[in-house]
């Protein structure tokens, strides 16, 4: 796999190595050994995934921007196995030089790209195709009492979701998240979330 660093430290794009022939293609979607060898040195620590999730959504669905509060913080490794999504990570670590900045990447069933979102970031995506199947790995189990979010429609974040507002389809919970300016982040750049 090929690792692409983004403009925000720790947020990574992972391009798998595909083997194609007349029958189709094959690739390893995840190898713990290769992830440890190639990603952990960049991050400065290991990541051990413990839970896999999958969602199916229709065009215009926007999920996010989600995170889990300490001590149940999560890193995620995400991909789109059917359709097309715009996936976004927003830095919400206090005192970070990139606080409030984001990285956006289009994940599709054709490009097979994976996106690594570290702890201390809010994560969300928008469905750009008729339907999309989205899979993600987490390095901590889901804890509903630690669930948190910021508004996915906060204009101050400067995210072009590539969906007209009238087509945006959000859960009731996601419509109630605070905007970044009204948000008191539980994360701090000076606290190592991986200890």
Model-predicted segments: where are they?
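Non-catalytic, conserved peripheral segments adjacent to functional cores
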Residues: 1-110, 131, 138-195
